[in-house]
């Protein structure tokens, strides 16, 4: 548990702050008369972080945050790594808009070792979309629905949040302090059109083993299911966003064949 975490450089050095996922402008490199578009977006960030930690409470398994007496200074990425992404949009055909995105997410630091080659480059996004009056179908890898909005609306998204001493990856933000990490996973997702500020998204996902300390149900015979219902509106200049998401999956123990299930429900409210 971190007692304090301070980003000395609280500003983010942005080379390209053009992300379609945040409805900002893109840098369009190629646009043809036939309607094809190629664009790129990205971001670079680096924080100076000094941290100290308190003693971990009892019964904490696999704790990776700072412990008692752990003081640290790092030059590192924050909760978000860097971003370099490429987008392709096809011309509208029979009312359908099709596109694809591939996103690389590198971190600037090594794992607290000068001559290490451990800086991570995450291939977090690679997906294809089809949009129409029916809504959107997405196939590929991107952020999961369950607790995804909890991550995207977190106050540490563009900052640092909870960190550990070493490591070549990002900080934890607020992960473990009210929500778990949704992760970027392979999926087939359908999202309805927005009606009166409301929309629903449902998806089938590449399943995961269901495990705890010393035990694992590793036989996955069915996909994982995730969903999210959300509402966005404006009341006298006050923007309101609320959501609820869910997850369900089963797995079996290899030797006994016994089945276990994992399920969860999460929600949130954001005012701006």
Label each PLM-derived region with a short phrase.
Residues 222, 227-272:
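Detector for outer-membrane/organellar transmembrane beta-barrel domains
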Residues 1-9:
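Bacterial N-terminal signal peptides that target proteins for export
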Residues 64-71, 169-174, 251-254:
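Extracytoplasmic loops and strand-loop junctions of Gram-negative outer membrane beta-barrel proteins
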Residues 70-73, 215-216:
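Second-shell loop/turn segments in exported
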Residues 9-18:
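Bacterial N-terminal signal peptides
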Residues 27-50, 72-209, 221-223, 230-233:
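Outer membrane beta-barrel
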Residues 52-65, 110-123, 152-155, 207-222, ...:
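Outer-membrane beta-barrel translocator domains and adjoining extracellular loop/strand segments
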Residues 19-25:
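Sec/Tat signal peptide C-region and signal peptidase I cleavage site
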């Amino acid at each position: 548990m971190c007692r304090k975490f301070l980003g000395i450089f609280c500003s983010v050095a942005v080379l390209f702050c053009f992300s379609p996922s945040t409805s900002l402008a893109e840098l369009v490199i190629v646009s043809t008369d036939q309607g094809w578009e190629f664009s790129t977006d990205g971001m670079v960030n680096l924080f100076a972080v000094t941290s100290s930690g308190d003693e971990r409470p009892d019964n904490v398994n696999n704790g990776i945050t700072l412990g008692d007496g752990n003081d640290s200074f790092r030059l590192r990425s924050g909760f978000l790594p860097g971003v370099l992404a490429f987008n392709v949009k096809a011309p509208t055909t029979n009312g359908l808009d099709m596109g694809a995105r591939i996103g690389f997410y590198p971190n600037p630091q090594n794992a607290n070792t000068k001559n290490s080659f451990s800086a991570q480059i995450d291939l977090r996004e690679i997906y294809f979309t089809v949009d129409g009056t029916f809504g959107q179908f997405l196939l590929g890898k991107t952020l999961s629905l369950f607790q995804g909005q909890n991550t995207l609306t977190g106050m540490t998204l563009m900052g640092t949040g909870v960190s550990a001493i070493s490591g070549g990856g990002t900080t934890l933000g607020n992960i473990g302090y009210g929500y778990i990490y949704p992760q970027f996973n392979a999926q087939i997702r359908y999202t309805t059109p927005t009606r009166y500020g409301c929309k629903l998204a449902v998806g089938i996902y590449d399943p995961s083993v269901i495990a705890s300390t010393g035990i694992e149900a590793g036989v996955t015979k069915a996909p994982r299911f995730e969903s999210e219902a959300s509402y966005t509106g404006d009341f006298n200049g006050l923007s309101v966003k609320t959501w609820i998401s869910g997850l369900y999956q089963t797995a079996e123990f290899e030797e006994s064949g016994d089945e276990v299930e994992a399920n969860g429900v999460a929600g949130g409210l954001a005012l701006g």
